[in-house]
Structures are given as structure tokens and as C-alpha cells.
């Protein structure tokens, strides 16, 4: 790995920290989204909700993290859960969120099983609604919302470009060749580099109010560095 390139990207992230978190860009929304999900998902109050209602309430702060003008995966989950509540809930609780004891290969297998299963639900319930489709970015975002200390959000283009720029040296892969352990390994290296940046961490904690998830693992911050490097052309 090219440590100098990694540190340069983190420095550019730090130099632009106030700008990317201003009212226009508001990248800190990711921490609000996780806090919202955690507060809803693990609350006793949701016991009386349907799964569709629970998921909708939990993801209401996700904003552009998953949805945009072309796709609406979170709304898709809600709509599919209204049609097949038991199956959609099973796919989340017993498959995607299943305890894997830290086994990343098993976690990746669970993700693929979840995606196959939820696509089958979509084909049965909304066959012409491609915007309700789910992908790895969706699945790993749901995992990061559910267990942020153990997971990283994943986006293919951002991960590939970051890995190339820091000369990671391990192929993350894509499609059938995707390797979760390789991606998480790269993110772990970003976390290690962030932990020795006290000035940046101080800036970050200063804007993390009560409405934000307190990311002790720095997993969200690591993804934010990877994401913002591409989104704001730090390369």
C-alpha cells in the first residue's frame, strides 16, 4: 500500500471538512441516519409495528445514502414488506442480520442469499419496478445501519477508485469475484490511519451532536473518507 497517498487523501478530507459538512453538502447526515435506525430498530415501541412500518421509520433519515431519482430501494423494501411481510422480515432477521460470529465469508454468503431472496420477492410483487431492486451497496448499508461497529458501507466505484489510488495491492473484486474480506481489510487500514489524526477526530466529534451515532469504531468515518475522495475529487 502507498501510505503517502492514503495520508494525502485523509489530509484533503480534513482540509475540506467544514465544506463537506456545511448546510449544502451535509455529509454528517450518515451519522444521523445510523442513529435514527438504531433508535427505532432496537426500541420496544416497534413491537406493535408491522415490519414495513418499522423499516420505514428506521430509514427515514437515510436521504441520498440509498435512494435517488432513478432508484428507490428503501421504499422498495417497504412496499415489498407490505405484500410479503413474513418473507421480507425473515430475509432481514434470519439471513442478512444473522449472527456470523465475525466470519466474513459467511457474512458475504448471507448478503448474497439476502439479495437473491429479496429479488425473488420483487419479481413476485413488483416485477416491472426495477427501481425497487437491491444490490450489494444496499445490503451493506443495511448491515452498517444495524451493526455499525462490525460493518462498513460499500459502494463499488468508490471502493475501486480508492483502492487503486492508495495502491492497496489486494483485489477487492466485483460481481462473482467480490471479496468482502479484502474490502473490509482496506477499510481497517483507513481506520488505523484515522486514529492517529487527533485534529481531524476533534473536528468530527465536535459536529456529532446528540442526533448522531457516536462511531467509536470509526467505520462510518472511514467510509466517508472513501466516498468523499471520489464525490469531491480529492484524487
What are these regions (language model features)?
Residues 1-132, 148-235:
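An N-terminal alpha-helical hairpin/helix-loop-helix interaction module that forms a charged
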Residues 139-146:
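Contiguous, well-ordered alpha-helical segments that form the cores/surfaces of helical PPI scaffolds
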Amino acid at each position: 500500500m502507498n501510505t503517502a497517498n492514503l495520508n494525502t487523501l485523509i489530509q484533503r478530507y480534513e482540509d475540506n471538512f467544514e465544506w463537506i459538512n456545511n448546510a449544502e453538502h451535509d455529509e454528517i447526515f450518515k451519522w444521523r441516519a445510523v442513529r435514527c435506525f438504531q433508535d427505532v430498530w432496537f426500541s420496544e415501541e416497534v413491537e406493535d409495528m408491522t415490519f414495513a412500518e418499522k423499516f420505514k421509520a428506521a430509514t427515514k433519515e437515510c436521504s441520498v445514502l440509498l435512494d435517488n431519482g432513478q432508484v428507490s430501494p428503501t421504499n422498495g423494501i417497504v412496499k415489498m414488506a407490505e405484500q410479503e411481510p413474513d418473507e421480507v422480515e425473515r430475509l432481514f432477521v434470519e439471513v442478512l442480520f444473522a449472527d456470523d460470529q465475525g466470519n466474513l465469508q459467511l457474512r458475504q454468503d448471507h448478503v448474497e442469499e439476502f439479495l437473491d431472496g429479496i429479488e425473488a420477492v420483487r419479481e413476485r410483487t413488483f416485477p416491472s419496478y426495477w427501481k425497487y431492486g437491491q444490490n450489494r451497496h444496499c445490503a451493506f448499508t443495511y448491515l452498517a445501519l444495524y451493526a455499525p461497529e462490525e460493518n462498513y458501507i460499500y459502494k463499488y466505484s468508490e471502493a475501486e477508485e480508492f483502492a487503486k489510488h492508495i495502491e492497496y495491492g489486494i483485489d477487492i473484486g466485483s460481481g462473482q469475484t467480490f471479496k468482502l474480506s479484502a474490502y473490509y481489510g482496506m477499510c481497517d487500514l483507513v481506520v488505523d490511519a484515522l486514529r492517529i489524526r487527533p485534529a481531524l477526530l476533534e473536528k468530527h466529534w465536535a459536529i456529532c451532536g446528540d442526533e448522531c451515532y457516536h462511531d467509536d469504531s470509526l467505520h462510518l468515518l472511514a467510509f466517508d473518507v472513501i466516498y468523499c475522495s471520489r464525490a469531491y475529487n480529492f484524487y
